[in-house]
Each structure stands twice: as structure tokens, then as C-alpha cells.
């Protein structure tokens, strides 16, 4: 079993809002991994005095502990408990009902001698490499599948870059984030109930050779710059390591016209070879 990971801020002048960790028991018969991508809020008040890096460190640490030690709890239950624990840590000082309260996308996986379990929430990704080398992406596509009116606003921002257009798009997206009627998409913030909306699953341990967890700053290699498919991305990381993928993304970002939004995003890659 081998773990290899890298995480890098998009801007060296800003704190990294991604999180990555893994735990392997002394027995060597299982493990768990967690990757989070903290959501950078727009400029202005977000109701929290701590900030996104604090939040992802708290949430990620709690989630890894629970996933690694509470085999009696499903991963969705682990996420719900981790969200509740993190919320309790700043409930008395911060406005957890603020729509921009710190939040994050989530990938968590856990394995033992019998099963491999996974959970994905929002637009970070988990790639599962089967015993025969086939690669299957586990994705939560709800953020990518926004309503037509919101997609139209997004396209307008990409065309114009105008501040007013961007503000309108941000407001529309915020209205869909963790929408109670299920019409939008979900991120882990202060409501433990969000865990029920995650993409979850499991498969026999014998059917899985490796796992690759990535934030969207790393999946740009496939999803933004179209440098290869998911199988090609996994092959690159297998052969050259997580750092090579991040370096390729940074090169592509520099060579292409600036993206609307962030030129460089925090990027995290965690490879877990189970055999």
C-alpha cells in the first residue's frame, strides 16, 4: 500500500484552502483518505471570524478521524458528524446561517480487506482504478448541471468579464447552493443534513487497485484544458506522480488565455495504491 499526495495554493500570496490527508492503521489492512476544497467566498462579509483554511482543517481532521476509527458508521454518517462537530467549534462566535459561511467540497474513501467505500459531494472528483486497469470517475455533477438561466449568466460573464454580470452570476449560484428544495447543488457547511445528498457507493476490495482524489484545480487537466480523459489523467499520476499533474495544469493555465474567475486555483492530488 502506498500514499502519494501534493497540495498547492493557486496564489502563493494566499493561504491554501484545499485539504488532503490519509490514515493507514498499524495493522496495514485498511485505510481512509479525505480531500476537501474550501469554497472561496466573494469579497465581503461571510459571517465567520475564522476563515476557510481554518474550516477545512477542522472539518477534514474530524472526517478523517471518524472515517478511520468508526467502521460502524457509514461515510455519510461520518460526514454529518464531522460537519456538526466543526459547526459546534464556532457556533458561539460566528453566524452559521450566513449564506457565505465557510464550506467545502468533499471526497472521502475508506477501505478494508472486504470493501472500498466512497463519498463525493460537489465538484471534487474520485477516480477508481479497477483490478484490470479500467478507470471509473465518481462525480457529483450537480454544480456543472446548473439551470439554463444560470448557465446563461455564466456564459455572459465569460464573454464580458463585467463586474455587474459577475455579481449577478454569483448571486444566482449562491441561491442554488444547499437549496432546501433540491434544485441546486450541495457543499459541506454547517448543516449536517447535507451529507444525505452526497454521492456514495462501495465495491469489493478485490475489484479496486488504486484510488485518486482530486480537487477541481487539478481536474482542470481533463475538464478545462482537455489534455486527456480520466484514464489518461490517472496514467499520468501513476507514472510521474501527483506533482507532475499539478505542474502540467500550471503550464496549461499560463499558456491559455486567462480563465474567467481564477487564473490559478488551489490544486490537490492524492493517490492511494491499495496493492
Name each model feature, range by range.
Residues 1-275:
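PP2C/PPM-type serine/threonine phosphatase catalytic domain
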Amino acid at each position: 500500500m502506498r500514499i502519494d499526495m501534493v497540495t498547492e495554493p493557486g496564489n502563493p500570496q494566499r493561504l491554501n484552502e484545499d485539504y488532503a490527508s490519509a490514515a493507514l492503521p498499524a495493522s496495514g489492512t485498511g485505510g481512509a483518505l479525505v480531500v476537501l476544497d474550501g469554497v472561496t467566498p466573494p469579497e465581503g462579509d461571510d459571517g465567520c471570524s475564522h476563515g476557510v483554511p481554518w474550516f477545512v482543517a477542522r472539518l477534514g481532521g474530524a472526517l478523517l478521524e471518524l472515517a478511520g476509527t468508526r467502521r460502524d458508521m457509514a461515510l455519510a454518517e461520518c460526514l454529518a458528524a464531522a460537519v456538526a462537530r466543526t459547526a459546534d467549534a464556532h457556533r458561539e462566535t460566528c453566524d452559521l446561517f450566513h449564506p457565505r459561511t465557510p464550506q467545502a467540497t468533499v471526497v472521502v474513501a475508506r477501505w478494508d480487506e472486504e470493501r472500498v467505500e466512497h463519498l463525493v459531494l460537489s465538484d471534487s472528483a474520485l477516480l477508481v482504478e479497477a483490478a484490470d486497469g479500467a478507470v471509473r470517475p465518481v462525480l457529483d455533477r450537480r454544480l456543472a448541471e446548473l439551470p439554463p438561466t444560470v448557465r446563461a449568466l455564466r456564459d455572459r460573464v465569460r464573454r464580458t468579464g463585467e463586474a455587474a454580470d459577475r455579481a449577478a452570476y454569483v448571486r444566482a449560484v449562491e441561491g442554488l447552493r444547499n437549496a432546501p428544495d433540491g434544485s441546486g447543488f450541495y457543499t459541506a457547511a454547517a448543516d449536517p443534513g447535507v451529507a444525505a445528498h452526497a454521492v456514495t457507493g462501495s465495491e469489493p476490495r478485490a475489484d479496486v487497485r488504486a484510488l485518486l482524489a482530486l480537487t477541481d484545480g487539478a481536474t482542470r487537466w481533463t475538464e478545462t484544458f482537455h489534455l486527456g480523459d480520466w484514464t489518461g489523467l490517472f496514467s499520468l499520476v501513476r507514472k510521474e506522480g501527483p506533482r507532475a499533474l499539478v505542474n502540467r495544469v500550471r503550464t496549461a493555465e499560463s499558456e491559455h488565455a486567462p480563465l474567467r474567475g481564477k487564473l490559478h486555483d488551489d490544486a490537490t492530488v492524492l493517490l492511494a495504491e491499495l496493492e
